[in-house]
Amino acid sequence: MSAIGATALPPGLVIFDCDGVLVDSEPLSMRVLLGTIAEAGALIDVAQGYESFLGKSLASITEILRTDYGIDLGSHAVDRMRERLYALFRRELRPIPGIAETLAAMPVPFCVASSSQLERIRLSLDVTGLRPYFGDHIFSASMVAQGKPAPDLFLHAAREMRVEPDRCIVIEDSPAGVAAAKCAQMRVFAFTGGSHAQSPAHRSLLETLEPTLVFEHMAALPGLMRELAGN
């Protein structure tokens, strides 16, 4: 057994983020978000968009826009942005390569916990055919007081799934998500297989947060879980 499983408790639950982990949605989401921001009168490039907004809830994003950029999108703009995004998801959203096979082979229970609203998570899973793997084990930042990088969402998911935090493994693609998992006292595997996460700079940023490990291919995950379980 390698260092990742030599001393840790065996995993009792895997908590997947959704965007950029289960579905390759981040480039689509960023396209719509930055377009909406441009309509409001500010230009933010893609790199800055990912740095500022990746992995954060809509409530957190709108607060960042107010405090850092002086932009108040307003409810009408937010509703229009959501409509555009959902239409784009229905046309273009794809699952992360290999994720269906990975979920089918997982040796431990799992759920999804995302900064997105519940409606969006369900749409993402429906469009990509992943919904049956999760059933009702879907948790949204709208269910807790604070979104990522606060630990609330992951702790809520663990409580609902009746697993202690130190037996949870979080799969995350964003710095905010990695920070949230660590704050929840959970192990976290940083995933870099999404199309938005290919740059060395993104991987380096995740590594500075010291996740349990960084991995690129979803097909490796069931084996990592078996290794941690000692099988």
Predicted regions: what they are:
Residues 30, 34, 58-63, 78, ...:
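An amphipathic alpha-helix signature
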Residues 4, 10, 87-112, 118-122:
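Short, acidic loop-to-helix structural element flanking the phosphoryl-transfer center
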Residues 1-12, 104, 117-231:
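Asp-based, Mg2+/Mn2+-dependent phosphohydrolase catalytic module
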Residues 2-51, 68:
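Active-site neighborhood of HAD-like aspartate-dependent phosphohydrolases
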Residues 43, 63-101:
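Metal-dependent phosphoesterase signature
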Residues 28, 53-57, 80, 94-98, ...:
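Short beta->alpha linker loops
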Residues 39-43, 69-72, 129-133, 162-163:
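Short helix-capping segments at alpha-helix termini
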Residues 36-37, 57-72, 124, 158, ...:
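Helix-loop "lid/cap" segments that line or gate small-molecule binding pockets
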